[in-house]
Amino acid sequence: MPTIQQLIRSKRTKIEKKTKSPALKACPQRRGVCTRVYTTTPKKPNSALRKVARVRLTSGFEVTAYIPGIGHNLQEHSVVLVRGGRVKDLPGVRYHIVRGALDAAGVKDRRQSRSKYGAKRPKA
């Protein structure tokens, strides 16, 4: 507990919150261009080939973003929309690509949680 004299000498310092997605620069999403589309393996104890893309954002950052859903149509030079959100078992992947926006097509034959994968409502 500081004394009044100590507070006069120097004010209390604000605790600055560190952002979990700095490349978005306080925007909800950012547009970017895929520079590389590849698969990577998760850390223990999981095992899979996770689809990720290296994306150069309009903010100037180059980030690794996860491609959610089964199957995708992304390749180099695809223009994608990137949102925040990490993938727990992929170290260094702190962003997600938004399916159904720009060049990233929605997931085919998706019936549940469609809005998360950019899938249209199926015909009855």
From Swiss-Prot:
Manganese listed as a keyword: no
Domain of life of the source: Eukaryota
A single BP term in Gene Ontology: translation
Disulfide bonds: none
Lineage: Eukaryota, Glaucocystophyceae, Cyanophoraceae, Cyanophora
This protein's name: Small ribosomal subunit protein uS12c
Role description: With S4 and S5 plays an important role in translational accuracy. Located at the interface of the 30S and 50S subunits.
GO function term, MF aspect, one: rRNA binding
Chain spans, region Disordered: 105-124
Family note: Belongs to the universal ribosomal protein uS12 family.
Subcellular location field: Plastid, Cyanelle
NCBIfam families reported in the protein's UniProt record: rpsL_bact
Record keywords: Cyanelle, Plastid, Ribonucleoprotein, Ribosomal protein, RNA-binding, rRNA-binding
Assembly description: Part of the 30S ribosomal subunit.
Main location (coarse class): plastid
Pfam families reported in the protein's UniProt record: Ribosom_S12_S23
An annotated GO cellular component: cyanelle
Biased composition (Basic residues): 113-124
Entries under InterPro entries matching the protein: NA-bd_OB-fold, Ribosomal_uS12, Ribosomal_uS12_bac
